[in-house]
């Protein structure tokens, strides 16, 4: 059964935002895109690269036009747009939202790194990123955030279109999370941020939370008994690491 579609009017503020997003072709800057400047891209010093990223992030003036940093299509952003369009179409029945949702899903499927990794998975970033801890991310480094959001996007689209390919791709990505990112043989089981990090020294808690959200969404679509204990372990990790004041 397809998702129920109603015909409620869209608030004017959402229509304005939708038009702005479409007119800008979903392109945007990112707060960590400083190294995407052709003027700065070849800098090798780790500390200087981090300084550039942070200066670009916190500068009160948008320096990107002067640094010739171009806007890009962000995978995670497109996954979130897909989820928003699915919700808007289900609420309003407006075919424009359905069209944009399908275009966004097409982009997601095209950006899959399955040929490289063996599973459908995605890199969040469209630009090189260097962390203070010397960690790096690239267009060819699949990560848990982009992959989890893509899974949720594909599931939300599948609920409307019943396109079996979307369900198959989501299922493949679930296998990537479980087989490549889940660390179970430790005192506190967790999901790694990237598969390339063979021996993570720290647990990135939002990585486990994102994976739990994606797997739970898939479980609602098609329950798998083998995923249940993984969800429970990830949930226990989040509960175990919560501070007394409720924060993480």
Indicate residue ranges for each PLM-predicted region.
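Glycan-recognition and catalytic cores of secretory/periplasmic carbohydrate-active enzymes
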Residues: 1-248
């Amino acid at each position: 059964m397809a998702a129920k579609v109603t015909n409620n009017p869209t608030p004017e503020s959402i229509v304005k935002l939708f038009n702005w997003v479409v007119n800008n072709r979903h392109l945007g800057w990112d707060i960590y895109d400083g190294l995407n400047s052709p003027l700065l891209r070849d800098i090798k010093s780790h500390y200087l690269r981090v300084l550039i990223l942070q200066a670009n992030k916190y500068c009160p003036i948008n320096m990107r036009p002067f640094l010739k940093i171009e806007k890009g299509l962000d995978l995670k952003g497109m996954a979130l747009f897909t989820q928003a369009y699915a919700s808007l179409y289900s609420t309003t029945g407006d075919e424009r939202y359905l069209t944009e949702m399908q275009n966004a899903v097409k982009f997601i499927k095209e950006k899959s790194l399955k040929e490289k990794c063996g599973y459908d998975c995605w890199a969040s970033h469209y630009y090189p990123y260097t962390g203070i801890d010397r960690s790096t991310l690239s267009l060819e480094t699949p990560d848990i955030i982009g992959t989890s959001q893509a899974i949720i996007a594909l599931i939300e689209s599948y609920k409307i279109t019943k396109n079996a390919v979307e369900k198959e791709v989501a299922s493949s990505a679930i296998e990537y999370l479980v087989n490549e990112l889940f660390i179970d043989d430790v005192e506190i089981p967790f999901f790694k941020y990237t598969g390339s990090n063979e021996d993570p020294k720290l647990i990135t808690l939002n990585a486990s939370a994102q994976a739990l959200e994606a797997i739970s969404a898939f479980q609602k679509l098609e329950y798998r008994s083998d995923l249940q204990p993984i969800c429970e372990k990830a949930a226990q990790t989040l509960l175990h690491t919560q501070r007394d004041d409720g924060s993480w």
